[in-house]
Amino acid sequence: MAFVPVIPESYSHVLAEFESLDPLLSALRLDSSRLKCTSIAVSRKWLALGSSGGGLHLIQKEGWKHRLFLSHREGAISQVACCLHDDDYVAVATSQGLVVVWELNQERRGKPEQMYVSSEHKGRRVTALCWDTAILRVFVGDHAGKVSAIKLNTSKQAKAAAAFVMFPVQTITTVDSCVVQLDYLDGRLLISSLTRSFLCDTEREKFWKIGNKERDGEYGACFFPGRCSGGQQPLIYCARPGSRMWEVNFDGEVISTHQFKKLLSLPPLPVITLRSEPQYDHTAGSSQSLSFPKLLHLSEHCVLTWTERGIYIFIPQNVQVLLWSEVKDIQDVAVCRNELFCLHLNGKVSHLSLISVERCVERLLRRGLWNLAARTCCLFQNSVIASRARKTLTADKLEHLKSQLDHGTYNDLISQLEELILKFEPLDSACSSRRSSISSHESFSILDSGIYRIISSRRGSQSDEDSCSLHSQTLSEDERFKEFTSQQEEDLPDQCCGSHGNEDNVSHAPVMFETDKNETFLPFGIPLPFRSPSPLVSLQAVKESVSSFVRKTTEKIGTLHTSPDLKVRPELRGDEQSCEEDVSSDTCPKEEDTEEEKEVTSPPPEEDRFQELKVATAEAMTKLQDPLVLFESESLRMVLQEWLSHLEKTFAMKDFSGVSDTDNSSMKLNQDVLLVNESKKGILDEDNEKEKRDSLGNEESVDKTACECVRSPRESLDDLFQICSPCAIASGLRNDLAELTTLCLELNVLNSKIKSTSGHVDHTLQQYSPEILACQFLKKYFFLLNLKRAKESIKLSYSNSPSVWDTFIEGLKEMASSNPVYMEMEKGDLPTRLKLLDDEVPFDSPLLVVYATRLYEKFGESALRSLIKFFPSILPSDIIQLCHHHPAEFLAYLDSLVKSRPEDQRSSFLESLLQPESLRLDWLLLAVSLDAPPSTSTMDDEGYPRPHSHLLSWGYSQLILHLIKLPADFITKEKMTDICRSCGFWPGYLILCLELERRREAFTNIVYLNDMSLMEGDNGWIPETVEEWKLLLHLIQSKSTRPAPQESLNGSLSDGPSPINVENVALLLAKAMGPDRAWSLLQECGLALELSEKFTRTCDILRIAEKRQRALIQSMLEKCDRFLWSQQA
C-alpha cells in the first residue's frame, strides 16, 4: 500500500461526495443518449431536474423520492428556478423561450397547476431565472439582454381578473448584451451581462452601472447578505478578468478589488468520494488567471464559482481561498446551504458537500468506510491535529479506526495513523490523556493513600458546604452535553466557512460544577486513567470518599479507575462504544498491581468469586463444543442453568456490593438507572444512618454505604438496570459471558437456584411468570447481552409479551441517554430529526430502534412511514413491537413499505419479510380487520355474501391480495380462506377457493355476489365441465326461489353490474359450448321456458357466426391445399 502524502497547509474544509445520484438518474432514465438532464435547481425541499425531453422531475431531498413529473411540449428545459421562500412554486424556461410557473399544491395534495405561461421571450434563449425573495415574482433574462418580471397572484379571483385587467408580465430593462446571471435581494435586482453589471431598484425603478471598466465575456455577480445581528449591510461581488473580484456596496459603488491569482497557484485539494481514493500532488502550479462565469453565495462567509477545470470557494472578505478542487466538465451548479449539486456536460449530476475535515472523517467512520477515513486523516494531518478538530476526532476514535484496518493490506496506512496519534497526544502528557475526563483547567495532588485530590481552578466557587455533593466528583452530564453541542455548533454547515484564523475562538472556559442541592443531576460515568497502588489502598480510598459526605469537607475525592484492558470491539462505531466496550467503565485492580506491592495480602473474597465464574465459564464453553450437548436442548439447558448459578452468585445485588465498593463507589452509583434526585436524597439520608452505625463499631457499614445509600439489595430489583459492567472484564472472558448470557435468553434459561450467604435456597425469582423473569434477566445482565441477538430473540419468544420488549427498549434508552444525538432528537420537526438520525447514527447500530421509538412517540404514524428509508436496519418485526398498542399504524407502515417497491417486485419483497411463516396469517388477519367495511355490508344473516359486496372498498386490499397470492402450504391456504370468509373479503376468498379446488364453494358465492363480471373476461371464473354448468344453473334456480330478492348496494336491482340470472348465464353458456349444446343442457335442467327472445336471437346469431367461421376455415384449407400441390408440381 502506497504511502499517503500529507497536505502541508492546514485546510479546515473539504468537498466530499457521500452518496451517488447515478441510481436516481438511472431510475428516471436520464442516463441515456436520447434523454439527459439539461438544467438543475435546488431548494430546502426539492431537487429539480429538467430534461431534454421537456420533462421536469421534482425529487424530494428527504430520502431522494421522486414526487412529481411536469411535462412541457415546448421543447427541452433550459432553465429551472425554485422559489426559496415557498417550496410550492417552481419556474421553468423551455428551449423555445416560454417561461412556465407551476404551483405544486403539495400541501393541499392536489395536482400541480400552471400558474402562468409567459411568451415574452418566445423565440429567444432564456439564460437566467431568479425568484424574488419576498413575493411571488420571477425575473427572466435572455440572450438578447431583455429582462422581465412575472408577478403571480395566488387567489382565484385575482387569477380570473389577470386575464382581462392586470398585466402580470413587466419589462424591467434591456441591457447591451446577453444576460449572464440574475440575483435578487431586498428590493434590488443584480444583472450581470457580457460587458458589465447593473444594479436595479425594482421599487423605485432606478438603475446603476457598477464600476467604470467594461469586460468582455461571461462573468457572474451575486449578492453577499449581511449579518442581521451585526447590522452589516449586504455586499455585492462581481467577477472580473484575471481571477479578480470587485467588492461593491449596496448602492453600487466599488469598494475594492480582490486579486486571487497568486492564491490559486496552490495544488487542488482532492474530493473525498467513494468512487476513488483521494490523491494529492504537492507540485505547485503557476498562478491561474481565470474568468468566473457565475458567482454563488454559499453558506455564510463563502462565494463559489467554477470553470471547466474545477470548483473554487473563496472567503472574499478576508481575500482567502478556502479551497479549490478539480471537478471536470461542469455545466451548472446549484447550491443550498452547504450542499452543491453539479450538472455535468454529459448530463450526470453529482452531489457534493462542503464540510469540515473532522466532520467528514466522522461521517466516514459512521458508514464504516475505514480505508477512506484513514486516508483522509493522513492527508489532512495538520487539520486533524488542530485543537478544534481534536475535540471531535479523539485519539480513541483514531485508535478504533486503526484497529479496523487489515495489517497485511494497509500496513503503511496503519503506520501513518500511529504517527498521527503520537502527534495527536504526546506520551508524556499524563494529565491531558485522551481518556481523562478531568478538565485541563484543574490540577490535582496525590495523597499518601494514592488518592488523587482534584483542585479546581475556577473562580467564584460556591460555599464549601455546597461543594460536597456526589456530583462534584465527576463532570455533570449537562456540562458535557454543553461542551459537545458547542463543538457541534462550530461544525454547522452554515457557519463552517470562517477564516483559518478563527480556529482559536473556541471557548476554553473552565468547567463549572453545579452544586445547588435542589437541582436534578444526571450522573455520567466515565473512566479515569488514575489507579491507586493496591486493592487495600483502593478500599481505604472509598472509606475516605464516603466519610467526606459526612464531614462536608471541601476536598473532592476521586477514586475512579480505568480499565487495564480497555479495547473497543471492531464492529462498533461512534457512540456505540460507550455501551459495548470489551471492558466496562469501572474496573477492578489488575494482578500486576498487587504483585508490585511489597506487602503480601490475601486476596479478598470477591476475587475468589470472580475466579470461580471464570472457571465455570470456561467449563461451559468447553461443553458447548460437544455436539451431544449443543444439539440436545435439554442437555444444553442444564449446562446453561448450571453456569447461570455462578453468574448470579458473582453478580448478585447483595453479595457483589463489596466488589463495587472496592472498585469505585461513585462509579457504581453511575451504573444504575435511578432518578437522580432520589439518589442524592438517599446519600444524605444514609450519611445520617452511617453515623449511628459507626457508634456500634461495625466497620463493614462504612464499606457498604456507597452502594446501600442508593438501593436495597432485593427490594429495588425491578427498578434497576445494569447498563455497564460493575468491574473490569477481560476481552476474552467478556465475549464468552456475552455468548452464554445471550444463549440463556434465547433458550429461556432465565434463573437458577441461588444460595444466599445464610445458606438457604432463594426461590423468589422462580415464583414469577416467564415474562417477569425475562424482564428481570434483561435488567440484571443487560451489559453482557449481544443486543442484536437479544432483540431478535425477544421478538420471536415474547412476541405476545409487550412488557419484555418495553423493558429491552428502556435499557437501550438508558444506554443512549448519555449520547448527545439522543438529546438533540428532542428538538425540531420530523424532517430535521430524520436527517439527524440519518447523518449521526450508523445503520447497523443497535440503538437505531431507540431513536425510532422516540420519533414514533412524538410524531405517531407519520414517523412510521418515514422509517421506511431505514429498512432493513429497522424491520417490520421491530415496528410491530414498537406500536403493539396501535396495530393499525403498523399496517399503514407495512403497506407503505411494500408500495415503496416496484410493482413487479412487491410480491417477492413481501415474501422475504414473512419470517417466520406464522406472520402471514397474523398480517392477513390484521389487514382484513382494519379499515374494512362493516360485516353487515359484506354478509347476510346466514353468512353468505351480500350482492356486489366484493366491490366494497378495503383500505389494504392490495396488501391482502399480495399476501393471498404468495405460495404457501395447503394448511396455511385453508386458514387464509377461513379468514377471508369470516371477514367477508370475497375477492381473496374466491382466489383461494379456486387454488384449493373448492370450485363448488366458489360458484356458490359468485351466485350470491350477483355480478356477471366475475364470470366474464380473461380473468373470469367460467365453469369447465358440464357438471359445473349444471351446478351453476341449479344454484341460480335455488336463489330465484328465495322469497325476497337480493338488493344491490345501491338499493336497486337496475343499478350496478349485470346480475347473475338464468338468461345471462344461458348466454354465457351458449358462447362457451355453442348454441345447440347450450339449448339441450338448458332443456335438461328445465330452464328452456324461462328464456326470452334475446336468447333466441343471440343463438341464431351464434349459429350464423359458426357457419361462416366453418366456411372461412374450409376456404382457407382448400387454398392451402392448392398452394401446396402447385409447389410440388
From Swiss-Prot:
Summed up, the tissue specificity of this protein is: Widely expressed. Isoform 1:Highly expressed in lungs and testis. Isoform 2:Highly expressed in placenta, kidney, testis ovary, lung and thymus.
A GO biological process of this protein is:
platelet dense granule organization
- Disease per record: Hermansky-Pudlak syndrome 5: A form of Hermansky-Pudlak syndrome, a genetically heterogeneous autosomal recessive disorder characterized by oculocutaneous albinism, bleeding due to platelet storage pool deficiency, and lysosomal storage defects. This syndrome results from defects of diverse cytoplasmic organelles including melanosomes, platelet dense granules and lysosomes. Ceroid storage in the lungs is associated with pulmonary fibrosis, a common cause of premature death in individuals with HPS.
> Quaternary structure per UniProt?
Component of the biogenesis of lysosome-related organelles complex-2 (or BLOC2) composed of HPS3, HPS5 and HPS6. Interacts with HPS6. Interacts with HPS3. May interact with all alpha-integrin chains that have an aromatic residue before the first lysine of the conserved KXGFFKR motif, including ITGA2, ITGA3, ITGA5 and ITGA6.
Describe the family membership recorded for this protein in Swiss-Prot or TrEMBL: Belongs to the HPS5 family.
Q: What does this protein do?
A: May regulate the synthesis and function of lysosomes and of highly specialized organelles, such as melanosomes and platelet dense granules. Regulates intracellular vesicular trafficking in fibroblasts. May be involved in the regulation of general functions of integrins.
Protein name, per record: BLOC-2 complex member HPS5
Q: What is the lineage of its organism?
A: Eukaryota, Metazoa, Chordata, Craniata, Vertebrata
